[in-house]
């Protein structure tokens, strides 16, 4: 029997998707634009990083070749990868976190999420009125589209004075609630989010997100690691449910449990920051038994650097991840499969602060598996189906496994 390890570099797109124009994202390229900025010296930051983007281990697996495939080009002739590589398009109608992860796990999202308009106020009066009444709140602040760090800096002090939570949204299907961990209370914030989750179901909102923070002034406010996502359950069983139904474990690292509304996730291991998440993933690799799936999300790429349009920070985070990749590769044993991918793009050079509609990389390795191109995949769901095949699980309805190509190339 086999084991599988699935690492999602949150938002690490490799070039605009065929339907990117529908999202206003034609030309977006998270990886390409970061690499270009680094090569031009525009991502140098004293004490952080300098020079061209340095990702030798992902490049060895085939990152550049995957980006070429995403762009419709042939990979560089003569390139000999140390693993397999390809690019995948998204079939889901959105470019959000749940859609990307659910599709990776074999279930594209066929319906349109609900969204709140970019107006002030953004939320329907009926929704906010019910939230205030049912959660016993003195009111709410913000009620608009906003960057989380900006809106906390702007309204955090008023929140502490008044006890009103900060409620905001974005171009994603989200209702976010920020509150101070001690002045408002972490458990109280979670309770308010549970109420909001129930109320926004009528609006087809994908996630309610608790955004706790600490500090006493606009200069010192800082979000903590106690974020919690309250997601709609996937519309049908995912790869995770198939693993669980077979009596095996799904170890979710980071926010995986929240993204799947804890359906099919048998164990959750939380950590703060990409490097701590990497430590947790390595620990789970050590603990994984035959037939288990370790599913990790590395959120900092998206939340700290993509949305904040921080090119140097994103580049440094990629380089830090790449430096540690040999630790994961070194833990692979006969029968193991490791896949690196992403759930969408978030080009830090792009206009605005939101996700970008992009193809994502598929990079992977495993003892005895073939090396080279798996080509352009027409759905992220091919990743989940490949893992299902590898773990000898029943096939799903949406993706096409490429495991046979890895075993018989």
UniProtKB/Swiss-Prot annotation:
Mn(2+) 2 binds at residues 302, 307, 355. GO terms for biological process: 2-deoxyribose 1-phosphate catabolic process; 5-phosphoribose 1-diphosphate biosynthetic process; metabolic compound salvage; nucleotide metabolic process. It catalyses: 2-deoxy-alpha-D-ribose 1-phosphate = 2-deoxy-D-ribose 5-phosphate; alpha-D-ribose 1-phosphate = D-ribose 5-phosphate. Keywords: Cytoplasm, Isomerase, Manganese, Metal-binding. It is found in: Cytoplasm. Its EC number is 5.4.2.7. Binds 2 manganese ions. InterPro entries: Alkaline_phosphatase_core_sf (IPR017850), DeoB (IPR010045), Metalloenzyme (IPR006124), Phosphopentomutase_DeoB_cap_sf (IPR024052). Pfam families: Metalloenzyme. GO terms for cellular component: cytosol. GO terms for molecular function: magnesium ion binding; manganese ion binding; phosphopentomutase activity. Mn(2+) 1 binds at residues 10, 343-344. Pathway: Carbohydrate degradation; 2-deoxy-D-ribose 1-phosphate degradation; D-glyceraldehyde 3-phosphate and acetaldehyde from 2-deoxy-alpha-D-ribose 1-phosphate: step 1/2. Its cofactor is Mn(2+). PANTHER family: PHOSPHOPENTOMUTASE. Isomerase that catalyzes the conversion of deoxy-ribose 1-phosphate (dRib-1-P) and ribose 1-phosphate (Rib-1-P) to deoxy-ribose 5-phosphate (dRib-5-P) and ribose 5-phosphate (Rib-5-P), respectively. Belongs to the phosphopentomutase family. This is Phosphopentomutase. It comes from Chelativorans sp. (strain BNC1).
């Amino acid at each position: 029997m086999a084991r599988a390890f699935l690492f999602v570099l949150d938002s690490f797109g490799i070039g605009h998707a065929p339907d990117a124009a529908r999202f206003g994202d034609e030309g977006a390229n998270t990886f390409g634009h970061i690499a270009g900025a680094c090569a031009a010296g525009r991502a140098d930051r004293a004490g952080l990083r300098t020079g061209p983007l340095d990702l030798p281990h992902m490049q060895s697996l085939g990152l550049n070749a995957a980006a070429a495939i995403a762009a419709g080009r042939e990979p560089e002739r003569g390139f000999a990868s140390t693993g397999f590589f390809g690019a995948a398009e998204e079939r889901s109608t959105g470019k959000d976190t749940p859609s990307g992860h659910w599709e990776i796990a074999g279930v594209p999202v066929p319906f349109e999420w609900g969204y709140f308009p970019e107006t002030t106020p953004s939320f329907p009066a009926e929704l906010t009125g019910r939230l205030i009444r049912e959660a016993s709140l003195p009111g709410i602040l913000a009620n608009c589209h906003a960057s989380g760090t900006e809106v906390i800096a702007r309204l955090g002090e008023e929140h502490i004075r008044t006890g009103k939570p900060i409620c905001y949204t974005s171009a994603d299907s989200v209702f976010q609630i920020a509150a101070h961990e001690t002045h408002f209370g972490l458990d109280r914030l979670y309770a308010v989010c549970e109420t909001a989750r129930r109320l926004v179901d009528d609006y087809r909102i994908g996630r309610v997100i608790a955004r706790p923070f600490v500090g006493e002034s606009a200069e010192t406010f800082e979000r903590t690691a106690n974020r919690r996502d309250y997601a709609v359950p996937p519309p049908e069983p995912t790869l995770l449910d198939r693993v669980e139904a077979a009596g095996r474990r799904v170890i979710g690292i980071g926010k995986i449990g929240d993204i799947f509304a804890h359906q099919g996730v048998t164990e959750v291991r939380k950590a703060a920051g990409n490097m701590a998440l990497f430590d947790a993933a390595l620990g789970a690799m050590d603990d994984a038994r035959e037939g288990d799936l370790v599913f990790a999300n590395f959120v900092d790429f998206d939340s700290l650097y993509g949305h904040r349009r921080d090119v140097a920070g994103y580049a440094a985070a990629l380089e830090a991840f790449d430096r540690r990749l040999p630790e994961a590769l070194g833990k692979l044993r006969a029968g193991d499969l490791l896949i690196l991918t992403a759930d969408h793009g978030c080009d830090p050079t792009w206009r605005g602060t939101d996700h970008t509609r992009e193809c994502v990389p598929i990079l992977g390795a495993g003892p005895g598996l073939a090396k080279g191109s798996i080509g352009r995949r027409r759905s992220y769901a091919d990743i989940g189906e490949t893992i299902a095949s590898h773990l000898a699980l029943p096939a799903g309805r949406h993706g096409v496994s490429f495991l046979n190509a890895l075993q018989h190339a």
